[in-house]
Amino acid sequence: MGWIPPNGRWLLVGGFEKCEKGGHAGRAAGDATCRLAYPPSVSNGAVARLCFAATFVIAAFSLGLQFVLDWLGVWDDPNIPGPSHAVRIWRFFSYFTTQANLLVVMTSLGLARRAGRDGPGWRVVRLNALTGITITGLVHWFLLHPLDDFRGLLWASDTLVHIIVPILVVLGWLVFGPRRRITTRVVVLGLIWPVTWLLYTLLVGRITGWYPYFFLDLGQSRPGVVALYCVAILILLFVVSCLFWMGDRWLPGRQPGRVATDGEPIDAPRLRPARRGR
């Protein structure tokens, strides 16, 4: 980085800065101005967008497969009459796994279109997608996976939404970011969705008698046990959010800036002119 004359510029060549100077020899150094041009973050690259696009396709396909299987009643006990299609749809979208994968689909599509996407609301949604899909993978692996005995399409669908998609999302964030998106405010606001989901699940379950997960079922467990599970889930969500927050601060990568096709930085922060030496 350095100071360059008005008609000089920083060119970004192979990810490194190169100063192209073409100022008039007689121009005083005190008149010089420059812009600090950050090298483009890796999250701005075509590889990053391709990764996010692949995550979007796999997550959307996985969610669609789950929906079709649920619509057809493949998961149902053949000895018990199944619910109506309207109830199936409502239950499908009541699962935390479904909502987390939906957030992944939306955010992955947004990042596939523009890898450096940003905004106050977007940051919260992106963190919800990261924490939600991570919790989906952890809870499934340690609590639900030991109880599963699926085969064929059931196994494939279950593995995709609970294991493959979480791994892709976390790896994509580790490699491509984008970074400098998570703040204390974002972490706090990110808790609104899981708290709302828990309250909704317990209230609707109390009314209808149906719960998406056995550990939240007040008909099978005492209220104190369910309360402990809820507290544990929220603590786990908060811890995972803090881990993403710390990674966002410490892992390599910087907030990407826009760079025109000719290498001229568009929105790089400006620095004050350098003072003349005395």
Segments predicted by a language model, with ranges:
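Membrane-interface transmembrane-helix boundary segments in multi-pass integral membrane proteins
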Residues: 43, 47, 94, 208-244
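N-terminal membrane topogenic signal
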Residues: 40-54
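Membrane-interface loop-to-helix entry segments
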Residues: 96-98, 154-167, 230-231
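Alpha-helical transmembrane segments of multi-pass membrane proteins
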Residues: 57-76
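Perimembrane loop-to-helix junctions flanking transmembrane segments
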Residues: 75-90
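Interfacial segments of alpha-helical transmembrane regions
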Residues: 117-133, 183-191
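Interfacial helix-start motif at the membrane-water boundary
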Residues: 87-103
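Non-cytosolic membrane-interface motifs at loop->transmembrane helix junctions
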Residues: 122-124, 148-161, 184-186, 216-220
